[in-house]
């Protein structure tokens, strides 16, 4: 058995190594640079195609945008932008036309039985969580027919900052 595993590993190394698609990087991943994306170009396109308002919040200068993509929430397309925060956390905002209660339930397959309400800039924000530490909190609020969902791993202050900035932002107007 050991010989067959060794043969497979050697064959894998011989086939993959020359392609350049293999890298070995010892050490902590937190020391690697964050790959930055241009979220404004993505939001510009999404605002043109969306049936609901899209919001592009101001973010602290030391936050780095690292993802912009689409995601299905309950069968409907949503726009998602994510940032690495100053404290090396991660927050993403998903914007959809799916009603809040439905979107909170269908955001992903994770079970979040706990629910609480928080006040942020005078608006009630729903926070769904789980006793399982591997399940991230999900924060949700509706604004002018758009459901805003925030998830990730970051401090309450960072979540409050991005949620407040989003709630205070005007609907994005494409260039």
Residue ranges and their predicted role:
Residues 17, 42-46, 162-165:
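Residues that form generic nucleotide/phosphate-binding pockets
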Residues 34-130:
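Short, solvent-exposed recognition patches
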Residues 21, 110-111, 166-169:
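Alpha-helix boundary/capping residues
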Residues 21-36:
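Ser/Thr/Pro/Gly-rich low-complexity linker/stalk segments immediately outside membranes or between
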Residues 115-175:
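A short, solvent-exposed beta-edge/loop patch
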């Amino acid at each position: 058995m050991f010989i067959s595993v060794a043969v497979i590993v050697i064959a894998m190394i011989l086939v993959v190594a020359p392609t350049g698609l293999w890298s070995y990087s010892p050490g902590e991943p937190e020391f690697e640079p964050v790959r930055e994306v241009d979220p404004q170009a993505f939001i510009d396109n999404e605002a043109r195609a969306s049936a609901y308002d899209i919001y592009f919040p101001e973010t602290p200068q030391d936050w780095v945008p690292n993802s912009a993509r689409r995601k299905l929430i309950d069968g409907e397309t949503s726009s998602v932008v994510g940032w690495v925060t100053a404290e090396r956390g991660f927050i993403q905002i998903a914007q959809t036309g799916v009603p809040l209660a439905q979107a909170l339930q269908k955001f992903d397959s994770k079970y979040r039985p706990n629910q609480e309400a928080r006040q942020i800039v005078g608006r009630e924000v729903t926070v769904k969580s789980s006793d399982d530490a591997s399940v991230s909190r999900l924060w949700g609020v509706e604004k002018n027919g758009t459901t805003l969902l925030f998830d990730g791993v970051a401090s309450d202050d960072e979540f409050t900052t991005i949620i407040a900035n989003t709630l205070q932002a005007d609907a994005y107007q494409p260039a």
